């Protein structure tokens, strides 16, 4: 009767060893090896009696990389039977994949921080926010207007700022707005607009969906995002207009928005009506020829629509810029972080659709102190390239004078052009004397609409004296 008592513990030990080993084998080779023979179990049990430490450690080492992937099975009863060593291994292994996502978390603050550039603006030291890449330009464009209007102020030593801080300042501005109308209905409508604006406020950090209409510089399809501009009293402009001198394009585009026009082009292409097919081709040609999303007609209408010294947001090519009008000319705020240390580069002129522009300081004086790294846009300090930039600028002013009605507006354009030209040559006289000075026939020369290539050739032959 003593043998059954000694033999009974052996099967119990074999069964526990079988359970542990079957679980480890199940993790390695699947459920096919789950059933075991009794003889094999006895052999395993004997092995478990001889080397109990080796029975538990090797399976934990073999399953080290497989211990974390099946955490869903941890609720099953055999899970806790693995002992303490698998728990230690699981803690070590599970901590490894948690360390991997930390690298993008370290990079996120770099994208979330924006450098603050301090400029003299109307006699007061004022901050503007710059961006290094395609950041949240709608948020920066709006906030820069609020900074230039002194509605939001920063500590004098502020050098960097986060998008969360900007959103907080903007939210406070929206909540501080009071309705001008006292009627109950208008107040409820105003409160609804504020609620809508606060809802879409986080979208400013990623981008806004706006849909332009080609009928006017301030025509956009209404979206909840537009309520932010309305509440803050910030005009939103674009310059993508159809030339009224092209009746075919006017008929093809009509009063449609951009999205509606794209749908129309697709529909007309598959139409059996030849007139619709032709109209679709005309509309498609309009989009292709105006891919810069700014036309000369739109530029003229934009100049006429903006008021003097008005701060607004200009939308073009999915980018939002801070814009102002000074002495009848349009300027865009330079927010490129590459110009962070360039104190004389604050504004960029907007006088043509080709992207040629010249930089100005905070007082809208032509800038000549650009760094070498910015030679692609500003001339890089080369006198010949700077003369070419100034010449293009003066030609654009005369073109604008030709398209606008004769009057005080045209005269102010000429006066500003002559002033800029005089400042340019006065600064160059300190380096080299100007041999010849001739009266500038601005009323005739610049209105001929010369191509860009001819203007470049002309600037090379007349590097000392530029005639328009």
UniProtKB/Swiss-Prot annotation:
Residues 22-41, 452-468 have a biased composition (Basic and acidic residues). Residues 68-80 have a biased composition (Pro residues). InterPro entries: MINDY, MINDY_domain. GO terms for molecular function: cysteine-type carboxypeptidase activity; cysteine-type deubiquitinase activity; K48-linked deubiquitinase activity; K48-linked polyubiquitin modification-dependent protein binding. Residues 1-19 have a biased composition (Polar residues). GO terms for cellular component: nuclear body. It comes from the Eukaryota. One of its GO terms (biological process) is proteolysis. The active site is at residues 137, 319. The record marks 413, 416-417, 420 as: Ubiquitin-binding. It catalyses: Thiol-dependent hydrolysis of ester, thioester, amide, peptide and isopeptide bonds formed by the C-terminal Gly of ubiquitin (a 76-residue protein attached to proteins as an intracellular targeting signal). The keyword Hydrolase applies. Its EC number is 3.4.19.12. Disulfide bonds: none annotated. The modification Phosphoserine is found at residues 103, 440. Hydrolase that can specifically remove 'Lys-48'-linked conjugated ubiquitin from proteins. Has exodeubiquitinase activity and has a preference for long polyubiquitin chains. May play a regulatory role at the level of protein turnover. This is Ubiquitin carboxyl-terminal hydrolase MINDY-1. It comes from Mus musculus.
């Amino acid at each position: 009767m003593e043998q059954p008592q000694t033999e009974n513990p052996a099967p119990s030990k074999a069964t526990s060893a079988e359970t542990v080993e079957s679980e480890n084998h199940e993790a390695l080779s699947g459920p096919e090896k789950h059933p075991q023979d009794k003889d094999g179990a006895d052999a395993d049990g004997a092995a478990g009696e001889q080397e109990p430490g080796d029975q538990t450690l090797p399976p934990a080492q073999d399953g080290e990389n497989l211990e974390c992937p099946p955490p869903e099975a941890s609720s099953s009863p055999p899970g806790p039977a693995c002992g303490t060593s698998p728990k230690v291994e699981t803690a070590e292994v599970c901590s490894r994949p948690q360390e991997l996502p930390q690298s993008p978390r370290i990079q996120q603050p770099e994208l979330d921080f924006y450098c603050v550039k301090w400029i003299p603006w109307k006699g007061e030291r004022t901050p503007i926010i710059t961006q290094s890449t395609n950041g949240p330009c709608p948020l920066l464009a709006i906030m820069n207007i609020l900074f230039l209007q002194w509605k939001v102020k920063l500590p004098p030593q502020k050098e960097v700022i986060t998008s969360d801080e900007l959103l907080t300042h903007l939210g406070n501005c929206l909540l501080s707005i009071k309705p001008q109308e006292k009627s109950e209905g208008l107040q409820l409508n105003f409160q609804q607009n504020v609620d809508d604006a606060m809802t879409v406020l986080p979208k400013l950090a990623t981008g806004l969906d706006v849909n332009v209409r080609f009928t006017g510089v301030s025509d956009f399809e209404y979206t909840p995002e537009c309520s932010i501009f309305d509440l803050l009293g910030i005009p939103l402009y674009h310059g993508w207009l159809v030339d009224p001198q092209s009746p075919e394009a006017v008929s093809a585009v009509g009063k449609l928005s951009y999205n509606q026009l794209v749908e129309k082009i697709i529909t007309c292409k598959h139409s059996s009506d030849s007139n619709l097919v032709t109209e679709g081709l005309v509309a498609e040609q309009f989009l292709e020829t105006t891919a810069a999303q700014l036309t000369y007609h739109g530029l003229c209408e934009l100049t006429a629509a903006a008021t003097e010294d008005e701060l607004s947001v200009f939308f073009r090519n999915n980018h939002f810029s801070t814009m102002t009008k000074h002495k009848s000319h349009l300027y865009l705020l330079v927010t490129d972080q590459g110009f962070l240390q360039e104190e004389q580069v604050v504004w960029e002129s907007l006088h043509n659709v080709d992207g040629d522009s010249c930089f100005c300081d905070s007082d809208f004086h032509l800038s000549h102190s650009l760094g070498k790294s910015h030679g692609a846009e500003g001339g890089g300090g080369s006198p010949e390239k700077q003369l070419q930039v100034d010449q293009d600028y003066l030609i654009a002013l005369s073109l604008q004078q030709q398209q606008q009605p004769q009057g005080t507006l045209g005269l102010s354009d000429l006066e500003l052009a002559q002033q800029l030209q005089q400042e340019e040559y006065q600064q160059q006289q300190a380096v080299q004397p100007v041999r010849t000075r001739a009266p500038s026939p601005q009323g005739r020369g610049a209105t001929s609409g010369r191509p860009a290539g001819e203007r470049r050739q002309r600037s090379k032959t007349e590097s000392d004296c530029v005639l328009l």
